[in-house]
């Protein structure tokens, strides 16, 4: 997706050979026009899958996932990383390791929000090692629902996430695939 690549080049910041900072438009300050385009593109790529719901992880996945759900005219459900007073009984949970934050947490979705047989699309901001998507996939399985695809805004293709997901048989669609962050330069998979 050329608009996204342009935004990454112009407003992204390479912090190391492993970390790309995109808080100017994706995961702190959000560019609503870009999110609309991202939602439209994911909807175009997955429209044939007859999706019932979009799921993501709080917080950074919410903006692109919401716009995708809006375009597909389906509900969005986001997994919570922290329990609240209202998130109590009948939880579907998975352990997820965050590459960026270097912490493991338990994420949860209320069982009442995912039903057996529903067709689910995961949308997330980044793909590195694939742990977030694998955790969400485990929650989908617990619900007896069917994961029909995974939409990733930015994939770090030099990390093993895509391979881990594809080995499980999941369809992965990434809007920007980064080949390298070496030398503080972003290079894309062409």
From Swiss-Prot:
Reactions catalysed, as given in the entry: XMP + diphosphate = xanthine + 5-phospho-alpha-D-ribose 1-diphosphate
Chain sites annotated for binding xanthine: 20, 27, 156
A Gene Ontology term for the protein's cellular component: cytoplasm
Localization, UniProt: Cytoplasm
Function field: Converts the preformed base xanthine, a product of nucleic acid breakdown, to xanthosine 5'-monophosphate (XMP), so it can be reused for RNA or DNA synthesis.
The encoding gene: xpt
Family indicated by similarity: Belongs to the purine/pyrimidine phosphoribosyltransferase family. Xpt subfamily.
E.C. designation(s): 2.4.2.22
Pathway the protein acts in: Purine metabolism; XMP biosynthesis via salvage pathway; XMP from xanthine: step 1/1
Classification via Pfam families: Pribosyltran
Ligand binding (5-phospho-alpha-D-ribose 1-diphosphate): 128-132
Gene3D superfamilies linked: 3.40.50.2020
InterPro entries recorded: PRibTrfase_dom, PRTase-like, Pur/Pyrimidine_PRTase, Xanthine_PRibTrfase
Organism: Azotobacter vinelandii (strain DJ / ATCC BAA-1303)
Main subcellular location: cytoplasm
Official protein name in the record: Xanthine phosphoribosyltransferase
HAMAP family membership: XPRTase (MF_01184)
The protein's assembly and partners: Homodimer.
GO MF terms, alphabetically ordered: xanthine phosphoribosyltransferase activity
Lineage top rank: taxon: Bacteria
GO biological process, one term: purine ribonucleoside salvage
């Amino acid at each position: 997706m050329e608009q996204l690549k342009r935004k990454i080049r112009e407003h992204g910041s390479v912090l190391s050979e492993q970390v790309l900072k995109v808080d100017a438009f994706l995961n702190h300050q959000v560019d609503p026009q870009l999110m609309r385009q991202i939602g439209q593109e994911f909807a175009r790529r997955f429209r044939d899958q007859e999706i019932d719901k979009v799921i993501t992880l709080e917080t950074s996945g919410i903006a692109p996932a919401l716009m995708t759900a809006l375009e597909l005219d389906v509900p969005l459900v986001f997994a919570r990383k922290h329990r609240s007073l209202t998130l109590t009984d009948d939880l579907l949970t998975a352990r997820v390791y965050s590459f960026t934050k270097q912490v493991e947490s338990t994420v949860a979705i209320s069982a009442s929000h995912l039903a057996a047989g529903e067709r689910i699309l995961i949308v997330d901001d980044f793909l590195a090692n694939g742990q977030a998507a694998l955790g969400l996939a485990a929650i989908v399985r617990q619900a007896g629902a069917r994961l029909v695809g995974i939409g990733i805004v930015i994939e770090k293709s030099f990390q093993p996430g895509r391979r881990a997901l594809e080995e499980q048989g999941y369809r992965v669609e990434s809007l920007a695939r980064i080949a390298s962050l070496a030398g503080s330069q972003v290079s894309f998979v062409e």
